[in-house]
């Protein structure tokens, strides 16, 4: 039986708490959150012991696994404390504030022998897995162009931390990081990035809130991604991509039914995808839990088998942080930046 402690009971924490109930051999035993109303809800919903901070929960002991779902600036210290205390760690994305903190987390995992996995969930999302398989297999020929989009309204979070770059806010870092990670997972690290965007106050109003990034690989194909946190309240969160191949086109749009279509003949086809396992009521800007459950299943399966995660390694998650940080640098320098 894996005894799990959860740091953070906001929208992501609530989602993970719901899904942790679905596993055999896994028991959520404690939840930490600075907000009294969140602790009251955690006690009422799950009957667990609650703590005002994650540090105290970890220090109290009795845990096998810690899930970290707090603002990004707290990821590294909590993950390192948990692994040092003998716990395996599942940490939500982004991995940490910068590559130095990521490296410290990786060093702690190696020193303690504990498993560290980062929640880059698109690697478990059926529509993105389908695209990666198509690129790898060359079923539709060589990739010619890929464009990704992830747009929605403003997120604020506890104490408006999503609007504060110094605490890991800014949509380019917290939301667009999904598509950056997907690009690296499917295509590897580009030679350079060129990013431009609209900016507000980085401490109080979200910093780079709308960006477009070009990932430069070669002259053979083009890759770009758009991210935003500026749509009006009535506009639904939207994630989509369009991938053009030599012999076909794959299009995903989270707002359409079916969400995925392949154009490689006289008429489009909708590939059969795994059914989502549950609806979430956590306040997350998605409606289904399948990919989040899948990454949990994979994490616990790795723990049971005594193997390290390969779908998303800590080193891969650190590389995503390096590239996103370079995108931010590119936005502010208004020029393309080479990735060594």
Give the role of each language-model region.
Residues 65-67, 218, 298-340:
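C-terminal helix-rich "cap/oligomerization" subdomain common to oxidoreductases
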Residues 122-205, 211, 334:
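Predominantly a Rossmann-like dinucleotide-binding segment in NAD(P)-dependent oxidoreductases
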Residues 52, 68, 91, 116-118, ...:
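Hydrophobic residues in well-ordered beta-strands that form the structural core
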């Amino acid at each position: 039986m894996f005894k799990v402690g959860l740091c953070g009971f906001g929208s992501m924490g609530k989602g993970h708490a719901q899904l942790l109930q679905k596993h055999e051999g896994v028991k959520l035993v404690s939840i930490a959150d600075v907000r009294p109303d969140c602790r009251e809800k955690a006690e009422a919903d799950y009957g667990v012991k609650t703590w005002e901070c994650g540090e105290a929960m970890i220090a109290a002991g009795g845990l096998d696994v810690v899930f970290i779902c707090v603002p990004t600036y707290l990821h590294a210290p909590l993950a390192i404390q948990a692994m040092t205390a003998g716990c395996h760690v599942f940490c939500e994305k982004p991995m940490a504030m910068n590559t130095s903190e990521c490296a410290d987390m990786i060093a702690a995992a190696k020193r303690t022998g504990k498993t560290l996995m980062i929640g880059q969930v698109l690697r478990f999302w059926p529509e993105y897995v389908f695209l990666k398989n198509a690129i790898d297999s060359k079923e539709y020929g060589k990739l010619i162009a890929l464009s990704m989009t992830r747009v929605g309204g403003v997120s604020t979070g506890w104490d408006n931390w999503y609007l504060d770059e110094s605490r890991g806010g800014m949509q380019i870092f917290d939301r667009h990081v999904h598509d950056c990670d997907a690009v690296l997972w499917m295509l590897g690290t580009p030679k350079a990035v060129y990013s431009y965007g609209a900016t507000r106050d980085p401490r109080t109003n979200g910093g780079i809130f709308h960006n477009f990034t070009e990932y430069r690989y070669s002259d053979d194909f083009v890759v770009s991604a758009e991210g935003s946190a500026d749509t009006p309240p009535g506009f639904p969160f939207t994630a989509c991509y369009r991938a053009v191949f030599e012999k076909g086109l794959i299009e995903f749009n989270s707002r359409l039914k079916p969400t995925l279509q392949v154009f490689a003949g006289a008429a489009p086809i909708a590939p059969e995808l795994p059914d989502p396992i549950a609806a979430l009521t956590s306040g997350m800007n998605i409606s289904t839990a399948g990919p989040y459950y899948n990454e949990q299943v994979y994490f616990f399966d790795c723990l049971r088998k005594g193997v390290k995660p390969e779908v998303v390694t800590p080193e891969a998650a650190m590389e995503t942080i390096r590239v996103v940080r370079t995108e931010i640098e590119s936005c502010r320098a208004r020029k393309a930046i080479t990735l060594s």
